[in-house]
Regions:
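Divalent-cation
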Residues: 2-249, 253-279
């Protein structure tokens, strides 16, 4: 079945001028280019999650067909593919084809990344700082969520932009490890700095980053009121303070939780939550 679906997916990609076909399957598919189209597979953790979700039953749904249709067409599969493309650095302005072949679901879908939540978030945040900064911090956050440090899960936060106002509303908890270093070695868009960021993510507090990507501080404690924030229940102090600082300044915050989620805040609102376990 997968071979047939993949063939149809490639033909469809040609028709809609897509440069990529994303395969969601428990089976192995070699990453390759075919007729100029990149073919690659999503992590098996997602196809397993898709199957597990599809086997759920309850009065809320009128059978498996409605559940699967809602799941694929309206939320997870399309958003997942768009987010995966973003993390891989693939910017698709045209439609993207997804080929799904699992124990419970088989089909081909067309995804419009430009209408996805991740792209809407990128576009909205890019009004305030370089999109490269946003992409770099999200990729670092994904690494922190996946790897932690020395086998230990970590949580941390990044506050980006409006540095002067953010510094006024925060204090240094420990000696700032980035103070006095040249800007070049503090630029978060340079992969050579990421190891240092991973190391200092163990510090309490958050990173402060300017709109060009220069890391101004690590281990910074945000001092703002968190009352009247309209956020989901159960969030910890780091999430609340990082959300609140975006309400009082023009900054944007990205928070990595110890549970592995990545949250983005702007103007006191939560723009997106990314579950990193399926990437």
């Amino acid at each position: 079945m997968l071979k047939l679906l993949l063939k149809e997916g490639i033909e469809l990609a040609k028709k809609v001028n897509s440069k990529a076909v994303v395969v969601i399957s428990n089976q192995e598919v070699e990453e390759r280019r075919e007729d100029g189209i990149l073919i690659f597979t999503a992590p098996k953790s997602y196809s397993m999650a898709l199957d597990a979700f599809s086997h759920m039953e309850g009065d809320e749904y009128e059978g498996r067909k409605k559940l699967v249709d809602k799941f694929i067409k309206f939320s997870h599969a399309g958003e997942y593919i768009s987010t995966m493309l973003y993390f891989r650095g693939i910017r698709e302005e045209e439609a993207v084809v997804g080929v799904i072949s699992t124990e419970s679901i088989n089909g081909v879908i067309i995804v419009d990344p430009e209408r996805s939540e991740i792209q809407k978030t990128v576009d909205e945040c890019s009004e305030r700082f370089d999109p490269k900064v946003f992409r770099s911090i999200l990729n670092i956050s994904l690494n922190i969520a996946h790897k932690g440090r020395e086998g230990r899960r970590l949580g941390t936060g990044f506050v980006i932009g409006d540095v002067d106002e953010v510094l006024k509303r925060s204090t240094q908890m420990v000696l700032n490890p980035f103070e006095g270093h040249p800007k070049k070695v503090r630029n978060i868009t340079e992969p050579s700095t990421w190891e240092s960021v991973m190391e200092f993510a163990q510090l309490d507090g958050v990173f402060i980053v300017d709109k060009q990507g220069t890391i101004m501080a690590a281990g910074r404690y945000i001092e703002v009121h968190t009352k009247e924030l309209k956020l989901r229940q159960g969030l910890g102090g780091r999430h609340l303070s990082c959300a609140a600082i975006t309400r009082e300044t023009e900054a944007v915050s990205i928070v990595v939780s110890e549970s592995g989620d990545i949250s983005v805040y702007k103007d006191g609102d939560e723009l997106i939550v990314i579950n990193t376990h399926i990437f």
